[in-house]
């Protein structure tokens, strides 16, 4: 299975460690994995101009780093979203990517999704609801959510749990 991990964090700390643990577990199980650093990309929010559903034929009118993300999004069997919680939500970069893939509607190939979240405080409910809504709308089967809070972030026990989760896919 081909897996794309969309890391929404602009930093190299907790979420990056979770994404790396997932990658290690998935590759150990024989899957092909690509990690995309969405948190470092310049992706604008959706303009709701509907160009993509008319003249654009599935392509967004905006020219930004979404173009770097789309090949992996379109060619993967599974998409893993990874993000720290910033003010009760995934990062703005990941949210912009979620909005902008509206241009294609549903993923061309992907059938599965998972979510990795890190937080200092553990306020995950809004981000999980947003992910589940996105998965339901796009027809992706939710394979699970892994969270790490405070001291758990980057702990070997938590990273081992994430590796094991990825190996079982």
Describe each PLM feature range.
Residues 37, 146-147:
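Residue-level recognition of beta-strand->loop/alpha-helix junctions
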Residues 86-87, 121:
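A short acidic, glycine/proline-enriched capping/turn motif at secondary-structure boundaries
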Residues 105-146:
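Short, glycine-/small-residue-rich phosphate/pyrophosphate-handling segment
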Residues 1-82, 88-99, 103, 153-169:
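N-terminal beta1-alpha1-beta2 submodule of the flavodoxin-like/Rossmannoid cofactor-binding fold
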């Amino acid at each position: 299975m081909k897996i794309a991990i969309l890391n929404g964090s602009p930093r190299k700390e907790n979420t990056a460690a979770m994404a790396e643990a997932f990658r290690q577990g998935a590759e150990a199980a024989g899957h092909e994995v690509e990690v995309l650093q969405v948190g470092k990309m310049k992706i604008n929010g959706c303009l709701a101009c509907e160009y993509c559903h008319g003249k654009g034929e599935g392509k967004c009118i905006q020219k930004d780093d979404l173009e770097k993300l789309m090949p992996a999004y379109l060619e993967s069997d599974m998409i893993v979203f990874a993000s720290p919680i910033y003010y009760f939500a995934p990062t703005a970069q990941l949210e912009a990517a979620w909005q902008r893939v509206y241009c294609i509607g549903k993923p061309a190939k992907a059938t599965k999704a998972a979510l990795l979240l890190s937080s200092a405080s553990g306020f995950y409910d809004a981000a999980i609801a947003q992910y589940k809504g996105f998965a339901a709308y796009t027809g992706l089967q939710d394979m699970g959510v892994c969270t790490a809070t405070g001291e758990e972030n980057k702990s070997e026990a938590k990273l081992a749990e994430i590796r094991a989760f990825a190996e079982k896919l």
